[in-house]
Amino acid sequence: MGKFLATLILFFQFCPLILSDYSPSCCTLTIGVSSYHSKPCNPAQPVCSWTLDLLALSADQALQPPCPNLVSYSSYHATYSLYLFPHWIKKPNRNGGGYYSASYSDPCSLKCPYLGCQSWTCPYTGAVSSPYWKFQQDVNFTQEVSRLNINLHFSKCGFPFSLLVDAPGYDPIWFLNTEPSQLPPTAPPLLPHSNLDHILEPSIPWKSKLLTLVQLTLQSTNYTCIVCIDRASLSTWHVLYSPNVSVPSSSSTPLLYPSLALPAPHLTLPFNWTHCFDPQIQAIVSSPCHNSLILPPFSLSPVPTLGSRSRRAVPVAVWLVSALAMGAGMAGGITGSMSLASGRSLLHEVDKDISQLTQAIVKNHKNLLKIAQYAAQNRRGLDLLFWEQGGLCKALQEQCCFLNITNSHVSILQERPPLENRVLTGWGLNWDLGLSQWAREALQTGITLVALLLLVILAGPCILRQLRHLPSRVRYPHYSLINPESSL
């Protein structure tokens, strides 16, 4: 009898642990068309936590709002408190009357059209506490501006609730659903790139193998080509494999997916096969079948012939271009100097027009301020008339509009200096040097021409030489050691 009781006690102790492995491991919060998984939680670990952003929740709910014409959340509501309202499935009995309070239970459901919730339209406007929900035990939250942390007991996962910002006239609301679910499966970790070095390292060192391949390649081309090897990325390597050697059917791990794999049944190699290639998955695997050889891609280029060094003389085209540039610069300098004389008088006339426009804008701004004061008086009077209905905006069921008139732009417009002092007359960096306008323009044109001439003399011969040798470089063929179309 004692052994039976001991076995029964052990069974009831370990039974919750066994069943908890098959229970849902998280709580999923849904708003609009988006879902948020909580941290791992279950009956053994009942606290389900979320860290949410109110701006992101508003964007999610805007795709599928519970009510039309909801006022969205913005930084305007950063200073207002946030309230949480559970939605009841069963309506409890009402005891007593009066206004709703935290000790009274009544179903709080979202009704459309939603025109803004005040403190008396829902039974819970602060810490949630009722015979069904306890604020600290079942649900609690903390708010830091737009950042929201929610802790929900796992037993309450499956009930909807609402979040409300109690801002008069601006009451954004979020309607959230919760349901138990499983955490998404964790993706298997990828094989680190650093582990490929010792896995892909053959018995013969890479240095000896590559030197042997390069030596054989040079001998086959009679030392008339240059061998270029690229070992930058393992994914670009090539594979030669023998189809005569089969791959074991046991499960193996793919190590490398090469960019090119070619069968070589009758190829004579200077050394043995070092790796295992599976043709079905086109990858190097961890099985020790030794039917392949991996090598980095390398190419062949003919050795360029040595030519005589050409004489570095300035061609006639350089002098011709320099002369044309100097002539164009002088013509542009003269034309620009002549336009400065007429430009000064034009600036004076434009400055007069701007002054008259500024005076007209200032007068209109003063009239607008008077109209704004008149509208504000009427607004205050209408708010007093509709005081019992919550103000004019609540009575009209519209958003409140306000005027934002500032004097900063008008004052800046009046303080700006004359246009002639703000416009550069063509002389860069506003140098004066005590010279007249004509002398400054002539000096600037001369400096520009000298700089252009030096640039053409220094860079012109190099550019022409590169262009002259470009056709001969394009004609050089490019050979690849591994060609898919060649027969091995």
From Swiss-Prot:
Segments on the Extracellular side according to the record's topology features: 21-442
GO cellular component term of the entry, any: host cell plasma membrane
SUPFAM superfamilies: Virus ectodomain
Cytoplasmic side: 464-488
Disulfide bonds listed in the record: 225-228, 225-401, 393-400
One GO BP: symbiont entry into host cell
Pfam family, one: TLV_coat
Keywords recorded for this protein, A-Z: Cleavage on pair of basic residues, Coiled coil, Disulfide bond, Fusion of virus membrane with host cell membrane, Fusion of virus membrane with host membrane, Glycoprotein, Host cell membrane, Host membrane, Host-virus interaction, Lipoprotein, Membrane, Palmitate, Signal, Transmembrane, Transmembrane helix, Viral attachment to host cell, Viral envelope protein, Viral penetration into host cytoplasm, Virion, Virus entry into host cell
Signal peptide limits: 1-20
UniProt modification remark: Specific enzymatic cleavages in vivo yield mature proteins. Envelope glycoproteins are synthesized as an inactive precursor that is N-glycosylated and processed likely by host cell furin or by a furin-like protease in the Golgi to yield the mature SU and TM proteins. The cleavage site between SU and TM requires the minimal sequence [KR]-X-[KR]-R. The CXXC motif is highly conserved across a broad range of retroviral envelope proteins. It is thought to participate in the formation of a labile disulfide bond possibly with the CX6CC motif present in the transmembrane protein. Isomerization of the intersubunit disulfide bond to an SU intrachain disulfide bond is thought to occur upon receptor recognition in order to allow membrane fusion.
Region Fusion peptide: start-end pairs: 313-333
Domain of life: Viruses
Marked site (Cleavage) residue numbers: 312-313
Annotated region described as Immunosuppression, given as residue ranges: 376-392
Lipid-carrying residues in chain (S-palmitoyl cysteine): 462
Intervals of motif CXXC: 225-228
TM helices/strands, residue ranges: 443-463
Coiled coil: 341-387, 397-429
Domain notes: The 17 amino acids long immunosuppressive region is present in many retroviral envelope proteins. Synthetic peptides derived from this relatively conserved sequence inhibit immune function in vitro and in vivo.
Function: The surface protein (SU) attaches the virus to the host cell by binding to its receptor. This interaction triggers the refolding of the transmembrane protein (TM) and is thought to activate its fusogenic potential by unmasking its fusion peptide. Fusion occurs at the host cell plasma membrane. The transmembrane protein (TM) acts as a class I viral fusion protein. Under the current model, the protein has at least 3 conformational states: pre-fusion native state, pre-hairpin intermediate state, and post-fusion hairpin state. During viral and target cell membrane fusion, the coiled coil regions (heptad repeats) assume a trimer-of-hairpins structure, positioning the fusion peptide in close proximity to the C-terminal region of the ectodomain. The formation of this structure appears to drive apposition and subsequent fusion of viral and target cell membranes.
Record protein name field: Envelope glycoprotein gp62
Native organism taxonomy: Viruses, Riboviria, Pararnavirae, Artverviricota, Revtraviricetes
